[in-house]
Amino acid sequence: MELGYLALVLHAHLPYVHHPEFPDFLEEDWLYEAITETYIPLLRVFENLTNQGVKFRITISLSPPLLSMFKDSLLQQRYLGKIEKLIDLAEREVERTRWLPQFH
């Protein structure tokens, strides 16, 4: 006997924060953090579920400002730059804490 259904509905929105007049704009970090900490991990979960043969359904709504920022080539380039900086920082932190066993 079926007891019911669970509907997952995710809504993604961020305010439009594109500022080409500045090389680095703090509010753009909201987008970069959301991509890194939310959207990419969600896609990985969906991919893993699919690879494991799990049948799932999900509804995702993406706001027009968010979609506009996703497709903006300048924001894409800036995001890649932010990721490169994070990788560099992580590598330097590993080196800095190499001799501290509580960090490894």
What residue spans do the PLM features occupy?
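Short, solvent-exposed turn/loop segments enriched in Gly/Ser/Thr/Pro and often Arg
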Residues: 61-66
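N-terminal regions that are enriched for targeting/export leaders
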Residues: 1-56, 69-104
